[in-house]
């Protein structure tokens, strides 16, 4: 039975909270997390990185972004940088906005790739809001098998 949840959500909705059905909330509107939620999706771009036998593959969910709004760069020889920016739509002075829920803002993520990554062969593609970056790996040198020879004598 805490009032703290009202700081983080716009309405209490716990059926076990006897005050959840109260229509008056003295804290409503004092602290708003809307600006944080507004840009959270873009600022905290989530990226998966997996290593296959042939390559390092990074996938980023960037819903609603165009490939022109995203950059993939190599810095300092081994650092892969993925960045982007989504701008708000231009407002016409006669427009009346009822809700603005789509996020806008910038993001930047950097990944230091291991020595076996071929940084000069990085490829990136964007399809259906998912950016896929493929960094091929250098082939591991096959070490000759060492066979021990018994010494007689």
Curated annotation (Swiss-Prot):
CDD domains associated with the record: ACD_ScHsp26_like
Domain sHSP intervals: 38-153
Family matches, as Pfam families: HSP20
S-S bonds: none
GO cellular component, as recorded: cytoplasm
Keyword annotations of the record: Cytoplasm, Stress response
Subcellular location field: Cytoplasm
Assembly notes: Forms oligomeric structures.
Membership in a protein family: Belongs to the small heat shock protein (HSP20) family.
Name of this protein: 17.6 kDa class I heat shock protein
Organism: Helianthus annuus (Common sunflower)
């Amino acid at each position: 039975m805490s009032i703290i949840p009202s700081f983080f959500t716009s309405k209490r909705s716990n059926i076990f909270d006897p005050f959840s059905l109260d229509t008056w909330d003295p804290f409503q509107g004092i602290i708003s997390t809307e600006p944080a939620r507004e840009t959270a999706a873009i600022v905290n771009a989530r990226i998966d990185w997996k290593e296959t036998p042939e390559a390092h593959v990074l996938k980023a969910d960037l819903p609603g972004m165009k490939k022109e709004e995203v950059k993939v760069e190599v810095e300092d020889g081994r650092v892969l940088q993925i960045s982007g920016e989504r701008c708000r739509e231009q407002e016409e002075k006669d427009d009346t906005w009822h809700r603005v829920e789509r996020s806008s803002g910038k993001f930047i993520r950097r990944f230091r790739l291991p020595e076996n990554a071929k940084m000069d062969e990085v490829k990136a593609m964007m399809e259906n809001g998912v950016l896929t970056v493929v960094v091929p790996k250098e082939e591991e040198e096959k070490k000759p098998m060492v066979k021990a020879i018994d010494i007689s004598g």
